[in-house]
Amino acid sequence: MSFPVPGPSSRESKSIRSGATLSQHPGKRSSRSTPHLRHEPDLATKLAFLKRPESYPGRVDRVESLETHMSWLFLAGSDVYKLKKPYRHERIDYATPAARRLNCLREVRLNRRLAPDDYLGTVRLTIDAEGRMALDGKGRTIDRLVHMRRLPEAFSLEQRLRAGTVTPMQIGRVVARLLPLFRDGPRARWSVRAYLRHLRTRITGTAAGLCRPGYGQARDQIEALAKALLDFLDAHADLLAARARERRIVEGHGDLRPEHVYLTAPPTIVDCIEFDRELRLRDPVDELAFLAMECDRLGHREVDAWLFAAYRARTADHPPRALIEFHKALNAFVRAKIALWHLDDPDTGPRRRWLARAGDYLARARGYIDGLRNRGHPHRNPASRRDSG
């Protein structure tokens, strides 16, 4: 069993050095510590150390480095080491060593729920009195990395979908893997009113983010999408309130995309959101709708039916189609905003790439909303504007 190696296409990744391609760093074995440093190492010095094969235990012939929006990954033999960027944006705070340490520990603990054998722990990046860096060496800790096994990318749901080899039985196993988390995970302590307020804030906050200056989005179109989602929320407050009243909102994964699901035996699911518990608090229907929406984006709309058939067959929960479509629309709306966040970072690739990605998500959100309208669902009911509970 190995840990995920996200490629540039699936994880918005690129080489740290080239900014475009996977970077491979062959090198001879030597000391596992750096040459003497007479000052506190800066980020570039840390990265240079982590790109060296001799920095890692065991025999590592080369290190492949990948940069994502919030971290660097160092692929060393059968292992992966993740260094979080000193990054702060809205709910995410990795700005200080203490914050990165806390989030590394959380990442390991939370992801062991669905990938218990693949999150090996955390590793300290240390520097000794002579200025030499090492992994778990003597001296002072200057940063922390997540240590993981490397999963074969060919096993990812994303790659299997692209190859056209995914079956309903495999999707059923993914649902079965998630069910203990949905059934036994900590419940949100939200009243009905708080849950409805959470959904409303998610919609309005996303709309505000999409309309930020510099993102180039048409405000009237964003506001129309937000209004349609709010109309559904108002018209179906009783349906959504019942989900909270039945205590279905659980601390789940929060980022259930095809590239985070591996069709191993049993399935392995990685990379949950660790930095904000509220973003992990989801209705299971919301989680599965997110995965279904991302599979739709890859051209595999059949996965939606497989996911919810497996879910209904294994639970006493039978969510109506309108609820599923609402969550697909809302998740696409949120993902459009996240795509546009990349425009704030010049190192994440061409601007047109992220504008196109956001446009695709917004088109999907409109499509799901149009589907709801065709079913006659999101008509505003003034009486339902009063949050229940």
Model-derived segments and their meaning:
Residues 30, 46-245, 253, 258-334:
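Conserved ATP-binding subdomain of kinase catalytic cores across diverse folds
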Residues 32-41:
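N-terminal non-globular leader segments, chiefly Sec-dependent signal peptides
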Residues 337-381:
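ATP/Mg2+ or Mg2+-diphosphate-binding catalytic cores
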Residues 2, 8-18, 23:
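Low-acidity, Ser/Thr- and Arg-rich intrinsically disordered low-complexity segments
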Residues 382-383, 388-389:
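Phosphate-binding active sites in nucleotide-utilizing proteins
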